[in-house]
Amino acid sequence: MILHALVADLDTARVAAEGGATVIQWRLKDVPTLEVVERGRSTRSLCARHGLAFVVNDDVEAALMLGADGVHLGRSDEGAERVKEHGLLLGLSAAGVAEAQAAAQLADYVGAGPVWATPSKPDADPPIGLEGLRDLCVAVAVPVVAIGGIDASNAADCIRAGAAGVAVIRAARDAAALRAALDAAL
């Protein structure tokens, strides 16, 4: 769970997998379920070959159709109970302690952030910073995966703040440098 690479194409997934990502999260925003499935088949196969967890972002039906290992749901997404009924890994997003505590009642892990400002999600909440991340990590009993503005220069800070791992979008192609920084912090 140390390095989640959020990807929207097979090439980025391949680079992330070869660089040491431990989870590939298939993230296609505003795309119909059948297209998520069709475009995700090759990435699912890549994950199986590399022994990596394959998680689908936001779309429970696509995850089930792809035989995914898990689903990550945002705060406004539905389907958490269905994910659990099917025995899949469930990640839920949270931007604060109260939200994380509520999510942790059902989730296998909590995605916390944004830690720092990020251009990958223009409508993101205000950054929680390392102190907010630390508070959130202490407040829940499930692993916390930090997200938002994370790259090789600051990933280790998230681990030192208590996160079990980090999730990246822009830095997914830099997985090798991220993994080296994370391994050094562990």
Model-derived features: positions:
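Short Gly/Pro-enriched loop/turn and capping motifs at secondary-structure junctions
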Residues: V115-T118, I150-S153
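Substrate-recognition "cap/lid" segment bordering the active-site pocket of phosphatases
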Residues: K121-R134
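A short acidic, helix-capping loop that chelates divalent metal ions and anchors anionic groups
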Residues: W26, A63, W116-P122
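Non-cysteine beta-strand/loop elements that form the S-adenosyl-L-methionine
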Residues: D108-W116
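Conserved N-terminal beta1-alpha1 strand-loop-helix module at the mouth
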Residues: M1-Y109, E131, D135-V144, D151-A163, ...
